[in-house]
Curated annotation (Swiss-Prot):
One of its GO terms (cellular component) is cytosolic small ribosomal subunit. InterPro entries: Ribosomal_eS17 (IPR001210), Ribosomal_eS17_CS (IPR018273), Ribosomal_eS17_sf (IPR036401). GO terms for biological process: translation. Keywords: Ribonucleoprotein, Ribosomal protein. The gene is RPS17B. This is Small ribosomal subunit protein eS17y. The keyword Phosphoprotein does not apply. The keyword Ribosomal protein applies. It comes from the Eukaryota. One of its GO terms (molecular function) is structural constituent of ribosome. Belongs to the eukaryotic ribosomal protein eS17 family.
Length: 140
């Protein structure tokens, strides 16, 4: 079984990645040296744990956004996706095709004069095909 990472390791790792994301890599030894330069960590063991978790998080960040880490690159990407406006609406309301029954319902509600509504003949549902040569299914 794996070891449990403490809250200290997780929090400090996330903070270091947010501040020094451009310097961090997917290599443990490089991340350990960077941590030695940028942070004051009381013990070698704790520094190694933070470097290891930072490396783990960097690998996860490569695959996609990670919960709890806010990076400028990811923020910009998210904003770009949210601000996207399609050229043509997915919901077209130029012409709405309804059957006679729906048209009568709209008329009873006083909405028969709404533009773009046209009556269409309802489609007949296909009869179900008998399975297994037309015999009844087995009873267990």
């Amino acid at each position: 079984m794996g070891r449990v990472r403490t809250k200290t390791v997780k929090k400090s790792s996330r903070q270091v990645i947010e501040k020094y994301y451009s310097r961090m890599t997917l290599d443990f030894h490089t991340n350990k040296k960077i941590l030695e330069e940028v942070a004051i960590i009381p013990s070698k063991r704790l520094r190694n744990k933070i470097a290891g978790f930072s490396t783990h998080l960097m690998k996860r960040i490569q695959k996609g956004p990670v919960r709890g880490i806010s990076l400028k690159l990811q923020e910009e990407e998210r904003e770009r996706r949210m601000d996207f406006v399609p050229d043509e609406s997915a919901i077209k309301t130029d012409e709405i095709k309804v059957d006679k029954e729906t048209l009568e319902m709209l008329a009873s509600l006083g909405m028969s004069d709404t533009s773009g509504i046209s009556a269409v003949e309802p489609q007949q549902a296909m009869a179900p095909i008998a399975a297994f040569g037309g015999r009844a299914p087995r009873r267990y």
